[in-house]
């Protein structure tokens, strides 16, 4: 259940975290990326910390709201948001799961990366060595190796290959081998996405294979971005993320259409710009603003659709 990421701040950071988290057994070494520090101006622009959503038994008075676990916005954002709770949907573009939880794709998902990109993961209790499992169990945990999201810590330290311990971290240079493994994984994931859900090896192939479903424009654009990431060269030690800032990762919904709101990643503690697009074509909706916040795209989309309907009636 990949991140469908609908409607939240888009950032290239979580995607790279996810992709690097697919390294499997051969990529357990750690690579550290430090988010740029937040300026006083960016922190001052943040809204007051949110409260936890009301519980199921909340009364009409609405006084049952309690402080939630605050985490940093997806990517390198500076403001605080509520962490996702156990059982809630999660993905690349959503706030991370609460302490002790991790975002996992559905166990039966053939495309765990795609599921997390679509926001179709679920916050579950962590199954790695830090929370009681043995190293052997970690190595054999298919879900963790193939699609688990690593955490984007509030203190700005982001561990790209899983784990949160501070001791024994390897320098970035030692992660280049793991990045090569990461490229192979992404390339293989890309191939699988193009096969339309072909059966795993070891199972009998059906006699008649259905033709793969046509890829939507948003899915095609996402495929192209993943392909570019898989072939990127990282010649220096500035960190993998700095090579991704120029890329725009499309925000697709679970049906493969563009989400109305598209956003650039957060950079240097400043929120990325957001704009509104047509869900079918990805083209800008005329008259909608491009702002560092919520442009309320549904209002402009409904207005556009209403105008088209009125024009059609006049033509008939």
From Swiss-Prot:
GO term, biological process aspect, one: positive regulation of growth
InterPro entries: Growth_fac_rcpt_cys_sf, IGFBP-2, IGFBP-like, IGFBP_1-6_chordata, Insulin_GF-bd_Cys-rich_CS, Thyroglobulin_1, Thyroglobulin_1_sf
Gene Ontology CC annotation, any one: extracellular space
IGFBP N-terminal domain mapped to chain residues: 31-126
Domain of life: Eukaryota
Domain (Thyroglobulin type-1) ranges: 215-297
Secretion signal, residue range per the UniProt entry: 1-29
Motif (Cell attachment site): 292-294
Post-translational modification, as annotated: Cleaved by MMP9 leading to release of free IGF2 from IGFBP2-IGF2 complex, which contributes to enhance the motility and the growth of astrocytes. O-glycosylated.
Entry-linked PROSITE patterns: IGFBP_N_1, IGFBP_N_2, THYROGLOBULIN_1_1, THYROGLOBULIN_1_2
An example Gene Ontology molecular-function term: protein phosphatase inhibitor activity
Chain positions covered by the region annotation Disordered: 189-217
Disulfide bridge positions per record: 35-76, 38-78, 46-79, 68-82, 90-103, 97-123, 218-252, 263-274, 276-297
Subcellular location per the Swiss-Prot or TrEMBL entry: Secreted
Keyword terms of this UniProt record: Disulfide bond, Glycoprotein, Growth factor binding, Growth regulation, Secreted, Signal
Comment block on domains: The C-terminus is required for IGF-binding and growth inhibition.
Functional summary from the UniProt entry: May have both growth-inhibiting and growth-promoting effects, depending on tissue type; increases IGF-induced DNA synthesis in the uterine epithelium. IGF-binding proteins prolong the half-life of the IGFs and have been shown to either inhibit or stimulate the growth promoting effects of the IGFs on cell culture. They alter the interaction of IGFs with their cell surface receptors.
Subunit structure: Interacts with IGF1. Interacts with IGF2. Interacts (via RGD motif) with integrin alpha5/ITGA5; this interaction induces cell migration, adhesion or apoptosis according to the context. Interacts with PTPRB; this interaction leads to PTPRB dimerization and inactivation.
Name assigned to this protein: Insulin-like growth factor-binding protein 2
The gene coding this protein: IGFBP2
